[in-house]
Structure formats: structure tokens, C-alpha cells
Swiss-Prot record:
GO cellular component: plasma membrane
Function: Involved in the import of serine and threonine into the cell, with the concomitant import of sodium (symport system).
Stretches that traverse the bilayer: 14-34, 57-77, 89-109, 149-169, 190-210, 224-244, 296-316, 338-358, 365-385
Gene Ontology molecular function: neutral L-amino acid:sodium symporter activity
Protein name: Serine/threonine transporter SstT
Family: Belongs to the dicarboxylate/amino acid:cation symporter (DAACS) (TC 2.A.23) family.
Subcellular localization(s) per the UniProt record: Cell inner membrane
Keywords from the UniProt entry: Amino-acid transport, Cell inner membrane, Cell membrane, Membrane, Symport, Transmembrane, Transmembrane helix, Transport
InterPro entries linked to this entry: Na-dicarboxylate_symporter (IPR001991), Na:dicarbo_symporter_sf (IPR036458), Ser_Thr_transp_SstT (IPR023025)
Length: 409
């Protein structure tokens, strides 16, 4: 028992990124051997696939209640304050997140990516044919019974009820707010536990994918990662630069490079916007910004300024759409941009938060929850790099927008 406890503690205290890399490596090797018609390896892969299915099943079970609680509690608990210029910062956060999502959609159309998914035959039956059908389905999903929405994984209904509950309880008693905060923290702990098991699940998923499709599957992940990282860099150096220039009419790059050097680099390694708040506060002080403003805007940005998350949600959702050969028009893509931006605002405070909101975007196109959760699992496979870049973009943009809003106000 002592040895088991020691091994468990060693695993839980270990570096998740390294553990996931080990899982990917072992799964890839095992899958490759099985792909070359090794009977023994194929038997092991079949057993390993159970780990992948269990991981996806756990994600599928926790995701609906997670989305509801995170979005509702973020509206109920967050105190926005009255600091001068805060309204401008909130507008910048929302506009920046939407433009990031729109950029991701455009890049995905130019460089379409596909994934290796299982059991996709049933997913095509419910694919919508036009924006009218999408909007009709959207409206009916919004008025779904909240209990049914959570139990069936209707993420549009969940989001609608979460926002409604948040607004309705915005001015509730301190005790009520504390209950929602405690529930939110409890759900977050459950998700963290599931994420800790990711190396085993990813081992099973990679082994199964490579055994079925060879290293073609891993090549698909590499292209997907290239599109994700490329889009995030485009947002950081082009979209954000355009926003800064539009607001200040000054060369944006000195400020952008300062934010990347002193905020993004730290966030890249911590992979947490919340953990990077002290770093951002220190940078704001160094830039001589208004303390009353940044003391509110930086923690707020760690919650709602999620450009990187919006990119992840949009790119991975469109990868699923491409894989299933669903035709997407301009208005469909615009609606996806809006939904991805709204969903991204609720992605903070939990490991892999942006990935857990992918089913919300996928549901716009009638993609089943089973398929959407396979896409989430793919996100965890590439998450070693994706999550780091995403957090770096999210966190550094908090300081960037606070700085330009301070100049404006």
C-alpha cells in the first residue's frame, strides 16, 4: 500500500506536459507496430482504446454542467467596479476576442484541416443545409428545458440558461454568490482530476489513431497545430496591432513587443492566465498605468479576454466540419465566430477550458456530442503546445488593451 501511495503521489505531482508527451510517444510507437500487422500489438491497442474511450466519456459527462456553472458563476460573482476607462477596456476585450475568432474562421477556410475521427457515419444525418435551418435550430435549442439541455448535451440551451441565471442572480445575496463560487470551485476540481488522467486517455487515443491510419493521423495533428499557432501569431502581431493603431494612432509594435517579452513568455510556461495576474500587474505598474484601472481590468481580462481560446474553439470546430464534409456558408461562419467569442469568455478558470467549449460550437452544425468529444480529445493531444501559445496570447493582450485604454482615457 505504501508503494502504491508513493507511485500515486509521484504521478499527481509530476509535470502534466511531460506525462502527455510520454503518452503520445508510447501510444504512437504501439500504434505503429500494430499498424504493421503485429497481432500482439493489435491486442494491446484494443485494450488501450478502452482508456481513450473512458477519457472521452469522462469529458462528455462533466462538460455540460461545467459550462453551465462556469458561465453562470462568472456573471453572478464578478464585480466590475466603476474605474474610469474600464468600459473601453471591456469593449476592447470583447472586440479583440471576436476578431480573433473571425480570423480563425478565415484562416480555416484558406487552410482547411481534417481529423481522424471514429464512428462518423451517423454525424452527417443531422447536418443543417442553410443558415435559416441553423438559426431555427438555434432558437429552439435556446428554449430547451434546462435539465434536458444538460442531460442531452444541448450546449446552446445550457449557455442560454447559464446567462439567464447569471443575470437573474447578479444582485443576489452574498450567501447565494458564495454557493455558486463554491460549486464552481468544486466542478473545477473534478475537471482537474479528469485532466490529470489525460496522459492515459491520450495514450489510448494516439495508439488507436496510429494503428488505424498510420502516422498519417499524427501528420494531421501537425497541420492542425500549425494552423492554430499561425492564427494566434497573426492575431498577436496583425489584429492586435491594428486595434492598437486604431485606438492610439501610434506605432503599435514597441508596446506589443514589451507585452510579449514581459507577459507572454511567462504565461507560455505557466499556462494559466490567473497565475500570470501578478506578472501583468507588475508590468502595468512599470508602464505607469492607472492602478485603479489595472487592478480591476487585469483580473477581469483573465476571465473574459480570451482571444486564444476563441481561435482554438473556431479552428477545431471547423476541422470537425471539414472532416464530416459539412458545407458552411459565410453567415454560418459569422455565427460560429460570435458563438466562439461568447464561449471563449467562459473558458477561463479551468484546465483545457477552451477545449471543453468546442461541443458548443460543433452543435451549431448538428455535430453529435460523441464526435465533438473526440475533437476535444484531439485538442488535448496537441494541447502541450496549443494551450501554452493560447495562454500567452490571452494574458499578454490583457496588458496591451489596458495600456491603450489608459492612454485613451
Amino acid at each position: 500500500m505504501g508503494m502504491f501511495t508513493k507511485l500515486t503521489k509521484s504521478y499527481t505531482d509530476g509535470n502534466l506536459i511531460i506525462q502527455i508527451l510520454i503518452g503520445i510517444t508510447i501510444g504512437g510507437i504501439l500504434g505503429f507496430i500494430a499498424h504493421k500487422s503485429s497481432v500482439e500489438a493489435a491486442i494491446v491497442v484494443n485494450a488501450a482504446s478502452m482508456l481513450g474511450n473512458l477519457f472521452v466519456g469522462a469529458l462528455k459527462a462533466v462538460a455540460p454542467i461545467l459550462v453551465f456553472i462556469l458561465v453562470a458563476s462568472s456573471i453572478i460573482i464578478k464585480e466590475f467596479g466603476q474605474a474610469n476607462g474600464l468600459k473601453n477596456i471591456i469593449i476592447l476585450y470583447l472586440v479583440g476576442t471576436f476578431l480573433a475568432s473571425l480570423s480563425a474562421v478565415v484562416v480555416s477556410f484558406i487552410f482547411p484541416t481534417t481529423l481522424v475521427l471514429q464512428n462518423t457515419s451517423n454525424a452527417l444525418a443531422s447536418a443543417p443545409q442553410s443558415i435559416i435551418v441553423v438559426l431555427k435550430d438555434l432558437v429552439f435549442k435556446m428554449v430547451d428545458n434546462p435539465v434536458h439541455a444538460i442531460s442531452s448535451g444541448n450546449y446552446i440551451g445550457i449557455l442560454t440558461w447559464a446567462i439567464g441565471t447569471g443575470i437573474a442572480l447578479r444582485h443576489s445575496s452574498i450567501e447565494t454568490k458564495k454557493i455558486f463560487k463554491d460549486i464552481s470551485e468544486g466542478i473545477t476540481r473534478i475537471v482537474k482530476f479528469i485532466i490529470k488522467l489525460a496522459p492515459f486517455g491520450i495514450f489510448g487515443l494516439v495508439a488507436t489513431s496510429v494503428a488505424e491510419a498510420g502516422f498519417e493521423a499524427i501528420g494531421g495533428y501537425a497541420k492542425l497545430l500549425l494552423v492554430l499557432v499561425g492564427t494566434m501569431l497573426f492575431v498577436a502581431f496583425v489584429v492586435n496591432a491594428a486595434i492598437v493603431y486604431f485606438v492610439t494612432k501610434q506605432n503599435p509594435y514597441p508596446l506589443i513587443m514589451t507585452c510579449i517579452k514581459e507577459s507572454a513568455v511567462t504565461a507560455f510556461f505557466t499556462r494559466s492566465s490567473a497565475a500570470n495576474i501578478p506578472v501583468n500587474m507588475s508590468l502595468c505598474k512599470k508602464l505607469n498605468l492607472d492602478e485603479k484601472l489595472y487592478s480591476i481590468s487585469i483580473p477581469l481580462g483573465a476571465t473574459i479576454n480570451m482571444a486564444g481560446a476563441a481561435v482554438t474553439i473556431a479552428v477545431l470546430s471547423l476541422s470537425a466540419v471539414n472532416t464530416l464534409n459539412i458545407q458552411v456558408g459565410f453567415l454560418d461562419a459569422l455565427l460560429l465566430s460570435i458563438i466562439a467569442a461568447i464561449g471563449a469568455c467562459g473558458a477561463s478558470g479551468v484546465a483545457g477550458g477552451s477545449l471543453m467549449l468546442i461541443p458548443l460550437a460543433c452543435s451549431l452544425f448538428g455535430i453529435s456530442n460523441d464526435i465533438a468529444m473526440q475533437v476535444v480529445a484531439v485538442g488535448f493531444i496537441i494541447g502541450v503546445v496549443q494551450d501554452s501559445i493560447e495562454t500567452a496570447l490571452n494574458s499578454s493582450t490583457d496588458v496591451l488593451f489596458t495600456a491603450i485604454a489608459s492612454q485613451k482615457s
